[in-house]
């Protein structure tokens, strides 16, 4: 039985993704479009967009979770860490939140809030703050501009 040999770009893609990505970039720069590994290239471009979307959604959820805890938790000790987390997530979010991703976040904002609220409630309950967890609002009390800006509760 004859062994089918994979094209060079498929072997590189499977064995050394970094080398494959550099090769594809070189081919694009040189205008050698017929040599591109289009199937994998399309897949990777789509995956990049998906990864960025997941990152933005995760950052927003984390910010909202920590804003809720800052607003509703009476505990003094963890506050500094919550502030630091919000600051770091906002800083990274600035680089990632494009106009099209902002529209997608706005369209799915209620669901994002529900998950952030659940995360905050779980964290508060875990630390014995059941009343604070129960007091979390069912609808998001923050605008997207407040979440992404310099606003604090």
Mark where each language-model region is.
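Surface/interface-facing alpha-helical segments and adjacent flexible terminal/loop regions used
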Residues: 1-153
């Amino acid at each position: 039985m004859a062994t089918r040999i994979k094209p060079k770009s498929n072997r590189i893609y499977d064995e050394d993704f970094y080398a494959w990505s550099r090769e594809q970039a070189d081919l694009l720069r040189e205008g050698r479009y017929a040599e591109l590994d289009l199937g994998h290239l399309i897949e990777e471009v789509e995956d990049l967009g998906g990864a960025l979307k997941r990152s933005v959604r995760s950052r927003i959820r984390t910010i909202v979770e920590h804003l809720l805890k800052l607003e509703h938790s009476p505990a003094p000790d963890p506050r500094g860490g919550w502030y630091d987390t919000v600051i770091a997530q906002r800083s990274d979010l600035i680089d990632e939140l494009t106009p099209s991703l902002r529209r997608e976040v706005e369209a799915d904002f209620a669901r994002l809030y529900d998950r952030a609220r659940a995360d905050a409630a779980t964290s508060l309950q875990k630390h014995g703050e059941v009343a604070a967890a129960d007091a979390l609002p069912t609808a998001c009390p923050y605008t997207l501009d407040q979440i992404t800006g310099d606003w604090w509760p």
